[in-house]
A protein has these predicted regions:
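Conserved AMP-binding/adenylation subdomain of ANL enzymes
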Residues: 217-234, 242-283, 291-293, 297-299
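Conserved AMP-binding A3 loop
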Residues: 34-38, 185-187, 191-218
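Structural core segment of the AMP-binding/adenylate-forming
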Residues: 82-171, 490-492
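Conserved pre-ATP/AMP-binding loop-to-beta segment of ANL
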Residues: 21-24, 145-149, 153-160, 164-198, ...
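AMP-dependent adenylate-forming
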Residues: 12-36, 156-160
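Conserved AMP-binding/adenylate-forming core of the ANL superfamily
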Residues: 25-77, 94-99, 103, 165-174, ...
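AMP-binding/adenylate-forming catalytic core of the ANL superfamily
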Residues: 93-103, 114-115, 284, 395, ...
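Gly/Ser/Thr-rich phosphate-binding loop
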Residues: 171, 278-286, 295-358, 371
Length: 551
């Protein structure tokens, strides 16, 4: 029978280290690096003792700023075993974002690698943030701007002034008695915060979402159950670990099912195909653009994908044609998960047994042990079947809250315990949900409510349009007017009159975009989400440059 577990992340790791000690857990196929459950658990214990040696304890905030490197998960579980909180840092962050997060999270220890995108020099960014580091003895950092910050660890063998490296942390751990580690482990409770993730800031400043062992291990377990995972599965993980998709839907699924996690350090379609082929992976995750890159790779046909059986496509609307190609060419029954970081993250999911139509056109049903409701934002009442409202969730997966921000927490979790997603959705007769837009994205033009998603989906039907976003542009006359931001396929030429002609007579006049902008890209967050709230400013700036009068 399916039930929620009160095991901590450390308990789960030790369970498999005892039950299946010699089974492979973490595999980096490209470098033939392999850890069994027993080996990995031992490395985690050594790292946990090393963290204790540098003053990390229960409740301490430890940042991990790295791609999917082998010791990323070692640090996550080492924190989990001693009750510390792993703060995941987006690898796309630049100086200002890093400083904001370190300050806001009261970070004590920061673990880094050097950036893998030519211009991202994490080491120098850290020195710019903590100039005292270059003249400090390791472990004795005193920063004026970041008084909580005491240590920086470089994940790897390289040595940098003022920073520990991994080998030194493991060595320091040898001085810590096993009893001290056991004592620290004994104090950890499944309802303690284990992971803090910063929301990507689609609506302003990022907030630290506090997630517990209970939140994420159970969400990962149920995600795996929806795809009928067993300990025989091998999941290829090419999505970033700093995001819920990687650390919960992937890592926690493997942790709670005792299966093998085949890691890809940084997304590369060729490396993904080679890893699936060589390791005989049974499942693969990705966002639509990743699957497109894999399918379109000129060497795709050289690899055997027949071992695959399932996986998750998430992150944005999954195109029907892409789903079909993945099922035909990669032999996978693709499922999708809808949620948000604040819901650990999964709220609804399609199941492997669902029909293609359900898996392709909906985000499935509620997760077990949760209550998902579509609520009318005006009245607070539950909407009838087929009527659009706000997607809300109550259950084991609701975050503990935003770090040091009770006001923002109270804004999203109501007095009945429902987490308000800010997303609009509808429920059908079978209990499956469709996401229809964002409440905050809604355009109010002269009293008419306009949902951008509806216009976007309509414009997608026009040949030549690769991507489109619709947002409100301030209007003196109507309050807001409809603005469409369009990316065209390569080689396609189109003007605003073509767009209006296409709309004419097919959608209501007030929904036809008044402002049409042809752009090369949209403003994005570090984790690849479109920042719709910035489109308004982009539109105003483009109007100014093009001499368009806003009325």
């Amino acid at each position: 029978m399916m039930e929620l577990s009160t095991r901590t992340l450390g308990d789960w790791l030790e369970h498999w280290a005892l039950t299946t000690p010699d089974k492979e857990y973490i595999v980096y196929s490209d470098r033939n690096l392999r850890f069994t459950w027993k080996q990995f658990n031992e490395r985690v214990d050594h790292m946990a003792k090393g963290l204790l040696a540098i003053g990390v304890k229960r409740g301490t905030h430890v940042g991990i700023w790295a791609g999917n490197v082998p010791d990323w998960l070692t640090f996550l579980y080492a924190c989990a075993k001693i009750g510390a909180v792993a703060v995941t840092v987006n690898t796309n962050y630049k100086q200002a974002e890093l400083e904001y997060l370190c300050q806001n999270s009261d970070m004590h220890t920061l673990c880094i690698v050097n950036g893998d995108h030519g211009n991202d020099d994490y080491v120098n960014m850290v020195y710019a943030m903590l100039p005292e580091l270059k003249t400090s003895q390791r472990g004795y950092l005193k920063s004026k701007r970041f008084p909580c910050m005491k240590n920086v660890i470089y994940i790897g063998p390289e040595k940098y002034r003022g920073m520990y490296n991994t080998a030194e942390i493991l060595l320091l751990g040898c001085n810590i008695d096993d009893d001290e580690l056991l004592e620290a482990k004994a104090k950890v409770n499944c309802h303690d915060t284990v992971n803090m993730q910063y929301t990507s800031g689609t609506t302003g400043f990022p907030k630290g979402v506090m997630l517990t062992h209970y939140n994420i291990s159970n969400n990962g377990f149920l995600t795996g159950e929806h795809m009928k995972f067993t300990s025989d599965d091998k999941l290829c993980v090419c999505v970033p670990l700093f995001h819920c998709f990687g650390v919960v839907l992937a890592t926690m699924n493997c942790l709670t099912h005792g299966c093998t996690q085949v890691m890809v350090e940084r997304f590369d379609p060729l490396l993904v195909l080679a890893s699936v082929h060589k390791e005989r992976c049974t499942a693969l995750y990705g966002v639509p653009t990743m699957f497109i890159a894999e399918l379109n790779h000129p060497m795709f046909d050289m690899f055997d994908m027949s071992s695959l059986r399932t996986g998750i496509m998430a992150g944005s609307l999954c195109p029907v044609e892409l789903m079909k190609r993945v099922e035909e060419k990669m032999f996978m029954k693709v499922t999708s998960v809808y949620g948000l970081t604040e819901a650990s993250p999964g709220m609804t999911a399609s199941r492997i047994d669902d029909s293609f139509d359900v898996r392709c056109n909906t985000v499935g049903r509620d997760f077990e042990f949760t209550e998902v409701k579509v609520i009318d934002p005006e009245t607070g009442e539950e909407c009838p079947i087929g009527v659009q409202g706000e997607m809300c969730n109550k259950g084991y997966n609701t975050m503990k809250g935003y770090y040091k921000n009770p006001e923002a927490t109270a804004e999203v979790i109501d007095r009945n315990g429902f987490l308000h997603s800010g997303d609009l959705g509808v429920k059908d007769e079978e209990g499956n949900y469709r996401i229809t837009g964002r409440i905050k994205d809604m355009i109010i033009r002269g009293g008419e409510n306009i949902y951008p998603r509806e216009i976007e989906e309509f414009l997608y039907q026009m040949e030549g349009i690769k991507d489109v976003q619709v947002a409100g542009i301030p209007s003196k006359k109507y309050g807001e007017a409809v603005g469409a931001f369009i990316i065209l396929h390569e080689g396609v030429e189109m003007n605003e009159f073509d767009i209006r002609d296409f709309c004419d007579g097919k959608i209501a006049r007030y929904k036809i975009p008044k402002y049409i902008f042809f752009v090369n890209e949209f403003p994005m967050t570090g984790s690849g989400k479109i920042q719709k709230f910035k489109l308004k400013d982009v539109g105003l700036e483009l109007c100014r440059k093009q001499g368009i009068e806003i009325i």
